[in-house]
From Swiss-Prot:
Principal location listed in the UniProt entry: nucleus
Protein function: Transcription factor that acts as a positive regulator of nonrepressible acid phosphatase activity. Is a major regulator of responses to nitrogen and carbon starvation and is essential for the expression of genes involved in vegetative incompatibility (like pin-c, het-6, and tol). Vegetative incompatibility is a non-self-recognition system ubiquitous in filamentous fungi which results in programmed cell death.
Any single GO CC term annotated in Swiss-Prot or TrEMBL for this entry: nuclear chromosome
Keywords annotated in UniProt: Cytoplasm, DNA-binding, Nucleus, Transcription, Transcription regulation
Protein name: Transcription factor vib-1
Positions with biased composition (Polar residues): 394-438, 553-568, 611-631
Record gene name: vib-1
DNA-binding region: 106-341
């Protein structure tokens, strides 16, 4: 009875898994499980022992068209009686052959698979041409029947539109829709044997096909009248396109298929010819009537693609024909249909805006591409519905533009010298771009913001000389220049210095310019992890950048210290004097101040003043310069500043009266 308890636990977990539907035939009673398992007569009762664990609703008859599988014992396969005493075998053989084969559910699964097919196939079917049927029988000279395979598809701004639901509640299907002003295209190919073909006439005779051509046309659905299709000419024809003189309302021309050679022999159908076909820039001349008003009056346009053949006797026949789904063409603006639901299609330009369609003119002359037949197939299957791309070539620009505005991009020419690079050892994760020289002044003068600690990733264009500093290496200098010691920046000269993260002295006679927008670090300039950010590579104190003079200062001075930039002059109590009508700079440590009375030599104004290494921090070190701050020049100050004439200092630490002091910088004014 151990085996029965094992099956009871299994039946509790899976009470009805894999079992056929229980019928009310009364074949198996409820006392089957009490029969000893070891008896030979109970061998056919092993399978239905789990019936007692089923629910009552399983005993209801299952009305299905197919008969139950328990009716015949010929399909029953039961284990041998000698194997039933082994627990491992009884637990592994719980279902017989009839329980595994559940055919009533296969139809349901197949239906579900058909319903959940990818939507792309459905969209491609809506945009594809469907074959109407062969008009005539095509044979070769041996009497073998051949079929001409034609595949074509629409390309353009097609979508599915829904009509307003009628009053009776019936659901209307979505229809293929486009706007009349939108251009569309047709591409496809034709495949048939590369042998002479003939048409079987009604009289039983055959006539050889001499020429074939493909045409495209449209027919409206109400009366069957033809609808004009026009080809919109190019305003600027694409490169390598044939020169065609087009009229404004020219209809799409027919595409002649280049015939095969007459001396080609029959190779048993091994060679097939594939002709690419296509029309570009097509447009419906008119729109459909009653768009969305009444379903029974709605007009549709249907495109017809026909393959015409000219026989040896001069007769012209339609060998094959393909049509599209009915198309609704809207003539009004899209805003008039905002209440309608539009479903874009994957295969059209409305569903994939990035789809590239090569346009080489108004049509394509179809030329054959011969293919050898593989041994496992009699005809090649054309699986690609893309447009033919053989007649399109892309020509790139021969010379890169040299204007500064076009150089401000992340794409760099490959002609730059890759050996000269800017390397930043303090940023191991950065990459180095090749450098170049860009002539011309900077068209955008820049002033640093008051809250920004430093400029990052945008060095000012400046001449530099060959040198090597601990923070970086710059190997893009001319070979004829000799290294020189750092020079002290004179206050009478006007020269820019690099930002702190470059730490280079500047000269006025260098021949190289550093491009402003060539960044050696791919991270954003505002990122704290940027290579030139102040938190990583700026070893100097913050605020070393000197900004332009305040609004109450003029641009007559060439260099002003950072301390005098941010703090307006105020009178100290220990100094005993303050600036009045004439502006004076703050006093030194001893509180001395002197009137600025020297000839004026103003440098041209500039936007920002980066620091230089030649600055000194000792107040006693003087240097002769022609700098002056514009003596006896009146400036406006806030009210409350004490106005007194300039007075000489009385303490013992004052400098010589001829020396003008400006914080920790000193120079002689005479």
């Amino acid at each position: 009875m151990a085996e029965l308890r094992a099956e009871t636990q299994h039946g509790g977990i899976w009470p009805n898994y894999g079992n056929p539907v229980q019928m009310n035939t009364g074949r198996y009673n409820t006392q089957e499980s009490s029969v000893p398992v070891g008896s030979a007569a109970s061998s056919h009762l092993v399978r239905p022992r789990s019936r007692q664990h089923t629910m009552d609703y399983h005993n209801a008859p299952y009305h299905h068209g197919r008969p139950a599988q328990e009716d015949g014992d010929g399909y029953e396969r039961y284990p041998h009686p000698s194997l039933m005493n082994i627990p491992s075998i009884t637990t592994g053989m719980k279902r017989s052959y009839s329980q595994v084969d559940q055919t009533p559910y296969t139809e349901m699964v197949q239906d579900l698979r058909d319903d959940y097919k990818p939507a792309m196939n459905h969209d491609q079917k809506l945009l594809s041409f469907k074959k109407v049927g062969d008009k005539h029988t095509i044979v070769d000279h041996k009497g073998r029947i051949h079929e001409i395979e034609i595949e074509a598809q629409l390309h353009g701004m097609f979508f599915l539109s829904e009509f307003p639901s009628p009053g009776d509640g019936n659901v209307l299907n979505a229809e293929l829709t486009c706007y009349r002003r939108n251009l569309f295209q047709i591409s496809g190919n034709i495949c048939f044997p590369q042998i002479p073909l003939s048409v079987m006439l009604e009289t039983g005779e055959t006539s050889q096909i001499k020429n074939m051509e493909v045409t495209i046309s449209a027919i409206e659905s109400v009366d069957g009248h033809p609808v004009r299709l026009i080809v919109i000419p190019w305003k600027t024809p694409p490169p390598n396109s044939p020169e065609v003189n087009q009229a404004p309302d020219q209809e799409p021309p027919s595409l002649p298929l280049i015939p095969w050679s007459e001396e080609e022999e029959d190779n048993g159908g091994d060679h097939y010819a594939i002709y690419p076909i296509g029309w570009r820039r097509l447009q419906f001349r008119i729109a459909t009537a009653n768009n969305g008003r009444r379903k029974e009056l709605q007009q549709h346009f249907v495109l017809h693609l026909k393959l015409h053949g000219t026989l040896a006797n001069g007769t012209k026949l339609v060998l094959s024909e393909l049509t599209t789904a009915p198309i609704v063409v809207r003539g009004r603006s899209p805003r008039n249909f905002q209440a309608r639901k539009e479903i874009p299609l994957l295969g059209s330009s409305a569903g994939s805006r990035g789809q590239t369609l090569v346009e080489t003119g108004h049509s394509i002359v179809a030329q054959a591409v011969a293919l050898n037949k593989p041994p496992y197939d009699s005809r090649p299957r054309v699986s690609s519905m893309d447009l033919p791309r053989t007649a399109f070539t892309f020509t790139s620009a021969k010379q890169m533009p040299q204007s500064p505005m076009q150089m401000r991009s992340n794409s760099y020419p490959t002609s730059w010298n890759p050996s000269s690079q800017v390397s930043m050892p303090h940023n191991p994760g950065s990459t180095s771009y090749p450098t170049t020289s860009m002539a011309g002044p900077e068209p955008y003068p820049k002033m640093p913001l008051s809250g920004a600690p430093s400029y990052t990733a945008e060095p000012q264009e400046m001449p530099i000389q060959q040198t090597s500093m601990p923070s970086m290496q710059l190997s893009m200098v001319a070979q004829d220049q000799q290294p020189s010691a750092p020079i002290r920046t004179q206050y009478a000269t006007y020269a820019s210095a690099p930002p702190p993260h470059l730490s280079l002295p500047s000269t006025a006679d260098s021949s190289l310019n550093v491009p402003r927008y060539v960044d050696s670090n791919p991270r954003p300039s505002k990122s704290p992890r940027h290579g030139s950010h102040g938190s990583l590579t700026n070893e100097t104190a913050s605020g070393e950048y000197r900004y332009g003079p305040p609004s109450y200062l003029g641009n007559s001075s060439s260099d002003i210290s950072p301390q005098s930039q941010h703090h307006p002059p105020t009178s100290g109590a220990g100094a005993g004097g303050a600036s009045s009508g004439a502006y004076g700079t703050p006093s030194q440590e001893g509180g001395a101040s002197a009137p600025a009375s020297a000839p004026t030599s103003a440098a041209p104004p500039r936007d920002y003043f980066p620091p230089s290494q030649s600055w000194t921090s000792t107040a006693g070190e003087g240097q002769t310069s022609s700098y002056t701050n514009g003596g006896d020049r009146s400036y406006s100050f806030p009210t409350g500043v004490k106005t007194e004439p300039h007075s000489q200092p009385s303490h013992s630490g004052a400098p010589v009266p001829g020396v003008y002091g400006n914080n920790h910088y000193a120079w002689n004014a005479t």
